């Protein structure tokens, strides 16, 4: 829906998500001082086996306005499963859509590209180093008179994001796997 764009949920390609963790309440403040009501952790996929996938969809919004979405992902894992990498990408191009013909878009124009990877290296039978990175480039524009600069229109809704993020994590397990030490850094 258009509401997902407001909250930026469309910025995260579904083909890179393994699971979503939701933590409610004050205990989530462990993730930062602003997380007093809760957090949502999106866990990206880890490579398990060699694979590749390409998908493309073309949807016509209202039967006339195109929404193109292309996703690519691949994973490579060594034969001994001590190292692996998962690569993902998405490109999406959606035209603006004016449902009621009043000159104002109900769905804004969208140009988005996402690229990233998650890799691991098992440094021993009881330890693992994980590194991940992603880049999200997204431009959204809605309102009216979309061919004019934003300051020359009656109403403009516009965002332009360049997001780089990543993380480095080290896991150390006890020999009986009952205990784990986890050290991580995210940006």
Where do the language-model regions lie?
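A general structural signal for stabilizing positions within well-ordered secondary structure
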Residues: 10-11, 30, 77
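Short beta-strands and strand-coil junctions in structured, solvent-facing domains, enriched
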Residues: 1, 27-30, 94
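Face-selective signature of the C-terminal outer-membrane beta-barrel domain
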Residues: 122-138, 155-187
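Periplasmic-side early beta-strands and strand-to-turn transitions of outer-membrane beta-barrels
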Residues: 41, 49-57, 73-157
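Transmembrane beta-strand segments that form the barrel wall of outer-membrane beta-barrel proteins
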Residues: 51-60, 91-92, 166-168, 183-187
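Extracytoplasmic
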Residues: 4, 15-17, 35-39, 51, ...
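Residues that define the transmembrane beta-barrel architecture of outer-membrane proteins
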Residues: 34-36, 66-70, 111-113, 160-166
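Short acidic/polar hinge/loop motifs at secondary-structure boundaries
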Residues: 1-24
